[in-house]
C-alpha cells in the first residue's frame, strides 16, 4: 500500500511542535504493516539542505504566480516529495511567522500552493507513482483534500488528521477567487467559515475519514468548550471521526543510547539516571536543593496552561524544589518566567527558545515534567517523560488523561500508576498537584516505583500504527469498519 502523507513539517528535517514528530515517526512504524509512505513537505531551507538522491519530477512555471519544482528525494530514512518554491518557503523567519512573530501575510498562498500540488501528486503527477490514499495533516495540508474533491477524483480515499483544532488556517474571503476552486466551494459544505475562508474546515468537509490524536479529544471536540467553532462540523461528521493516540519513536527517544545525554540508563538500570540530574543542574547554573527538579518543555501559551504554572511556581520554591523552563511563546508569559528567575535565582532557571538536544537532557535529568494544559489533543511531552523516567504531572484533559495513570492510592497499591493527574485545571488544581508530587517524592520507594512503572509503559507506535493500517484498509475495503469507533 502506498500513502501520500502531506505535512508542513517533519522531524528531523524541520519542527515547531508535535506535528513534526508524528509526521516523521509514523511512516517508520507503518512499514511493519507493509505500508510505504512518501511524505510531501515544503522546501524550507532546512529541508533542502538535508536532501539526498534529489531528482526533479515536475516543473511549475506559475504556481500561484511563482516558479516551483517538485523534487523526489530521501533524507534521514524518509522518502520525500519536496516543493522547492523559494518565493514561498525560503524565508528569514520561522516556518509560519516572520522574525517579529507575525504570521506571514501570504500564508494562505504558501499553503494553498502546497495543497494544490499535493492533490496533483495524488492524481498521478509523478510518473510511475500514485498513492492508494492521501493523508493530510492539519490546516496547512487540509486544502489538498478539497482540491482533490473538486477535481472530480473520488478514486483516492482522503484522510485528514487534526493535531490541534485550535489552529485552523482562517483567511479573509477576498482571497477565495485566487484559490482556483469553483464558486460552489465557497459554501457551508466547503471553505466558507463565518464569512471567511477556513482551510481546516474545507479539509474536514472533504475528508472521507478524520482522525484526531486521542479518543478523549475526539469526544471533547464535539462540544463548544473544545470545538473551537467547528463543533457543528465535527458533530455532522462524527461517524467519520476516529481517535488514535500518538506514539513516539523509540529509537530517537531511548535513554539507553541517546546521543543527546551524557549518562545512559534504562528501566532495568534506573540508578544510572542519577548523574544526569547533576549535569542538568550544572547546565542551568542551579544548586542541588535535594528537592525534586520540576521541568516544563512546552510552548509558553495560555493553551498550555503556562500562566497557571507562573502563578504557582512559588509553591515549588517554598517547598525546596527547583523549576526549569524551556520553551517560547507569548511575550507576556516569557516575561513572567524571566521575572521569576530573577526573583528566585537559586530555584528557577528559564531558557527561552527550543533546542532538541536540550529537551532530551531535561527529560533525562528532571524528576517531574509539568504539563498543565487547558486542553491537549494528545501531547507528546508526557510520553517522552515516561520513557525517560521523569514523572509526568498533567492536567486531566484530552490525551493526557488517557496516557497517564494517576498515582491515587488504588493505582499505587496495584503498581500501575505512572504519573499525577489534576483537575480542575486552574491554579488551585495545579497547586494541589504540586503538593502531591512533593509528598510522593519524599516517599522514596514509592517515587522510584512510580518512575520505573512509567519507564515500562509502551509509548511506541505499535498499537496506533496498527489502527492507522486498519483505517487505511477500511477505506480501500468499505466492508470493514473502524471509522466512528473512537
From Swiss-Prot:
GO terms for molecular function: alpha-1,4-glucan glucosyltransferase (ADP-glucose donor) activity; alpha-1,4-glucan glucosyltransferase (UDP-glucose donor) activity. It is an enzyme of class 2 (transferase). InterPro entries: Glyco_trans_1, GS/SS, Starch_synth_cat_dom. SUPFAM superfamilies: UDP-Glycosyltransferase/glycogen phosphorylase (SSF53756). Pathway: Glycan biosynthesis; glycogen biosynthesis. Gene3D superfamilies: Glycogen Phosphorylase B. GO terms for cellular component: cytosol. It catalyses: [(1->4)-alpha-D-glucosyl](n) + ADP-alpha-D-glucose = [(1->4)-alpha-D-glucosyl](n+1) + ADP + H(+). Keywords: Glycogen biosynthesis, Glycosyltransferase, Plasmid, Transferase. Its EC number is 2.4.1.21. Synthesizes alpha-1,4-glucan chains using ADP-glucose. Belongs to the glycosyltransferase 1 family. Bacterial/plant glycogen synthase subfamily. This is Glycogen synthase 2. The gene is glgA2.
Amino acid at each position: 500500500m502506498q500513502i501520500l502523507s502531506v505535512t508542513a513539517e517533519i522531524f528531523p528535517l524541520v519542527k515547531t511542535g508535535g506535528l513534526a514528530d508524528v509526521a516523521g515517526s509514523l511512516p517508520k512504524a507503518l512499514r511493519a504493516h507493509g505500508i510505504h509512505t512518501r511524505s510531501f513537505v515544503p522546501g524550507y531551507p532546512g529541508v533542502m539542505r538535508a536532501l539526498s538522491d534529489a531528482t526533479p519530477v515536475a516543473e511549475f512555471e506559475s504556481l500561484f504566480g511563482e516558479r516551483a519544482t517538485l523534487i523526489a528525494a530521501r533524507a534521514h530514512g524518509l522518502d520525500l516529495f519536496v516543493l522547492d518554491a523559494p518565493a514561498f518557503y525560503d524565508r528569514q523567519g520561522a516556518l509560519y511567522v516572520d522574525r517579529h512573530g507575525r504570521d506571514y501575510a501570504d500564508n494562505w498562498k504558501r499553503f494553498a500552493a502546497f495543497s494544490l500540488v499535493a492533490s496533483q501528486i495524488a492524481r498521478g503527477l509523478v510518473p510511475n507513482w500514485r498513492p492508494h490514499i492521501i493523508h493530510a495533516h492539519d490546516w496547512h495540508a487540509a486544502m489538498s483534500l478539497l482540491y482533490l474533491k473538486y477535481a472530480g477524483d473520488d478514486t483516492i480515499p482522503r484522510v485528514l488528521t487534526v493535531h490541534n483544532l485550535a489552529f485552523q488556517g482562517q483567511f479573509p474571503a477576498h482571497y477565495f477567487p485566487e484559490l482556483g476552486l469553483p464558486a460552489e466551494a465557497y459554501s457551508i459544505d466547503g471553505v466558507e467559515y463565518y464569512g471567511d475562508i477556513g482551510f481546516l474546515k474545507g479539509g474536514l468537509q472533504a475528508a472521507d475519514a478524520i482522525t484526531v490524536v486521542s479518543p478523549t479529544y475526539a469526544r471533547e471536540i464535539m462540544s463548544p468548550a473544545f470545538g473551537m467553532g467547528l463543533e457543528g462540523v465535527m458533530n455532522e461528521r462524527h461517524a467519520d471521526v476516529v481517535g488514535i493516540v500518538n506514539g513516539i519513536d523509540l529509537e530517537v527517544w531511548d535513554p539507553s543510547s541517546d546521543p543527546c545525554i551524557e549518562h545512559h540508563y534504562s528501566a532495568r538500570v534506573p540508578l544510572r539516571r542519577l548523574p544526569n540530574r547533576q549535569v542538568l543542574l550544572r547546565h542551568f547554573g542551579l544548586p542541588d536543593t535535594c528537592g525534586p527538579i520540576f521541568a516544563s518543555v512546552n510552548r509558553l501559551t495560555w493553551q498550555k496552561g503556562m500562566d497557571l504554572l507562573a502563578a504557582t511556581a512559588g509553591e515549588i520554591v517554598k517547598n525546596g524544589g527547583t523549576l526549569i523552563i524551556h520553551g517560547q511563546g507569548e511575550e507576556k508569559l516569557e516575561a513572567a518566567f524571566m521575572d521569576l528567575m530573577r526573583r528566585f535565582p537559586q530555584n528557577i532557571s528559564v531558557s527561552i527558545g527550543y533546542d532538541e538536544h536540550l529537551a532530551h537532557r531535561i527529560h533525562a535529568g528532571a524528576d517531574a515534567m509539568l504539563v498543565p494544559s487547558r486542553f491537549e489533543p494528545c501531547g507528546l511531552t508526557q510520553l517522552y517523560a515516561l520513557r525517560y523516567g521523569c514523572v509526568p504531572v498533567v492536567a486531566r484533559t484530552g490525551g493526557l488523561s488517557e496516557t497517564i495513570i494517576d498515582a491515587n492510592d488504588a493505582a499505587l497499591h496495584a503498581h500501575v500508576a505512572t504519573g499525577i493527574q489534576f483537575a480542575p485545571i486552574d491554579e488551585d488544581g495545579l497547586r494541589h498537584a504540586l503538593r502531591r508530587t512533593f509528598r510522593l517524592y519524599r516517599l522514596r520507594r514509592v517515587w522510584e516505583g512510580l518512575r520505573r512503572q512509567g519507564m515500562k509503559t509502551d509509548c511506541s507506535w505499535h498499537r496506533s500504527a496498527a489502527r492507522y493500517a486498519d483505517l487505511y484498509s477500511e477505506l480501500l475495503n468499505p466492508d470493514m469498519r473502524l471509522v466512528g469507533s473512537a
